[in-house]
Amino acid sequence: MREVISIHIGQAGIQVGNACWELYCLEHGIQPDGQMPSDKTIGGGDDAFNTFFSETGAGKHVPRCVFLDLEPTVIDEVRTGTYRQLFHPEQLISGKEDAANNFARGHYTIGKEIVDLCLDRIRKLADNCTGLQGFLVFNAVGGGTGSGLGSLLLERLSVDYGKKSKLGFTVYPSPQVSTAVVEPYNSVLSTHSLLEHTDVSVMLDNEAVYDICRRSLDIERPTYTNLNRLIAQVISSLTASLRFDGALNVDVTEFQTNLVPYPRIHFMLSSYSPVISAEKAYHEQLSVAEITNSAFEPASMMAKCDPRHGKYMACCLMYRGDVVPKDVNAAVATIKTKRTIQFVDWCPTGFKCGINYQPPTVVPGGDLAKVQRAVCMISNSTAIAEVFSRLDHKFDLMYAKRAFVHWYVGEGMEEGEFSEAREDLAALEKDYEEVGAESAEADGEDEGEEY
């Protein structure tokens, strides 16, 4: 089997994780107590969903995941929630003391006390796999735990499981909506390690997802549950080909191969279509061409950045439901003729498509309508640099006055780490600039430079 272990870190990671496992269970017909009436091979078997669930002799299906947090309140919600019987108690690891929105606490003082326990649990899960494919890591980089403990854990995973791929689903701070004053510090420090220790990182931001909920689902005041259920649909579409047998299957490592032209340029934009409420869906039939176009709309992007300001390097389209390759090819051909969607000149084809015949599932009583077909797009665009330049700008404003820095230094960090991380991001912005530059003109100029 090609198993995948999911790691959910900090409040955002755990709450997105809850939404994901809720959706996976519905998709596979697994009950909240882990029993799966439709499963004929009790106690093992080589079913496709075993990539995400392990089976006990008693026929119980246990998610291959760990939930980590430095304080107990969020994990306690899992311990008492609907799916409390689904998880093994050892998979839910919580500390007693919060990271207090401080990267240094999550990474140095409090984080390092808990990280060995986490790695121990992950080792147990890994030993339970026959052919571990990689890790999905869910965290946010604005807070203290997601950024600090998240990057610490990624660094340690690189040491222990060097060759395994690591996909990150990372919630970045939004341009307008902020939950902490020190978000820019935490994000810059954390991205510094995401750069080195993840293979693909899908960027999400709450504001963009809020806007999608408000605009497309007519929810006036979206809650985190609304946001997370939408994010869960994206993640479910990405992992569908690992969990179901499909026509055009896509492996975790395949994302890497097709989306990452240079190791550092691995921050992805994602979008999902159709995001549509039940009332509207009743009156519309959405064709493959329509949902494909809508996935490329700037308003559908799950991070606040405008793909029209950049160029696409590569793009992965994961269809599910009633979709045939002929429709996909036609839709992609149409996209290629659009002037607004520009590719870099050194990557002319740029599309990777996957199809999975399992139609999208929706959470009963949720906001999304049940549809026949859906598409999820993950794209590598130079426009994502906007997100970094926004963060860097906010970082610079605070760091120029050394505001709040003493909280980090007091937890054993050195001031040099701030400037090191900031320089790394400056280099990243420059990398994106160069990648998007026209290669034909560039050839003449840089003959003098040595590589």
Swiss-Prot record:
Subunit structure: Dimer of alpha and beta chains. A typical microtubule is a hollow water-filled tube with an outer diameter of 25 nm and an inner diameter of 15 nM. Alpha-beta heterodimers associate head-to-tail to form protofilaments running lengthwise along the microtubule wall with the beta-tubulin subunit facing the microtubule plus end conferring a structural polarity. Microtubules usually have 13 protofilaments but different protofilament numbers can be found in some organisms and specialized cells.
Species whose genome carries this gene: Chlorella vulgaris (Green alga)
Residues reported to bind GTP: Q11, E71, G144, T145, T179, N206, N228
GO cellular component entries: cytoplasm; microtubule
Gene: TUBA
Catalytic activity: GTP + H2O = GDP + phosphate + H(+)
Active site, UniProt feature: E254
UniProt keyword Cell wall biogenesis/degradation, yes or no: no
Family annotation (InterPro entries): Alpha_tubulin, Tub_FtsZ_C, Tubulin, Tubulin/FtsZ-like_C, Tubulin/FtsZ_2-layer-sand-dom, Tubulin/FtsZ_GTPase_sf, Tubulin_C, Tubulin_CS
Cysteine disulfide partners in this protein: none
Cross-referenced SUPFAM superfamilies: Tubulin C-terminal domain-like, Tubulin nucleotide-binding domain-like
Statement: the UniProt record of this protein carries the keyword Lyase: no
Protein's name in the database: Tubulin alpha chain
GO molecular function, one term: GTP binding
